[in-house]
Amino acid sequence: FSSWNADAVLARYMVDGDKDYLLDMKKDLETEYQRWERTNRLKNGLYWQGDVQDGMEESISGGRRKKYARPTINSYMYGNAKALSCIGILSGDEGMAMKYGMRADTLKNLVENELWNTRHQFFETMRTDSSANVREAIGYIPWYFNLPDTTQKYEIAWKEIMDEKGFSAPYGLTTAERRHPEFRTRGVGKCEWDGAIWPFASAQTLTAMANFMNNYPQTVLSDSVYFRQMELYVESQYHRGRPYIGEYLDEVTGYWLKGDQERSRYYNHSTFNDLIITGLIGLRPRLDNTIEVNPLIPADKWDWFCLDNVLYHGHNLT
């Protein structure tokens, strides 16, 4: 399955400061990256992945056995390369830092030049010889890793978050644009990613959105947009009146599509805590010892908030 393990390990280090653990993982993380290079890299330098191995079966853009260049795997590999480069710096390995820094730069250019659909103004899956020509939530994953340039060219993609023909639905953000003729056409109950809401995807998009709002000089999104999507994300996670998270839910009714099946309730694929801490409350982990806090909370929503017992870089902040 696709993953962003190196990025996640570095992100953990930016919170707990445990350098010994980070360096202990260095060899394994590099070995994993090299394996992906051997098995999933295309001739043009991009990476392919099937829908199933991305954890996103039955999508509009791909298929269970299709080897397409998707925004997911290519963003993950970029994030992992950036992380490995940083780990190289932290370990005093200049060769490693340079090697993976160059890989990250190459992938950044490939994603921006090959996966950006200029007609749709969106990052999309590239099939064998053409774009899949469908906007899907995975098109926001490049911002999960701060991949796109800080130019106005790419920020227009975020307007789709607020468009009811795009990804905006009564119960949250859909996994495919609602205007597409194949939206929700693949049935129900077999892991469809053709439009229904998946907390996994919502969590990725909300993380990417927080990065976009914190790290880019953008004018598209406001705190109220992020706050509203967080409200929907939280409100959707109930079943029969109790807190619950399952596989995926109907975008209009909020019904968990496999809610009463045993398998569904084992899905803990939501980075709920991280979204609250680093997004909504806005404690932004860093490599240095600066404490950066930028809440994405509209001025008229809360009089106050308290995030208590926050362990950061070996200190209890509150």
Which residues does each predicted region cover?
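Alpha-helical scaffold segments in carbohydrate-active enzymes
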Residues: 28-42, 76, 83-86, 99-117, ...
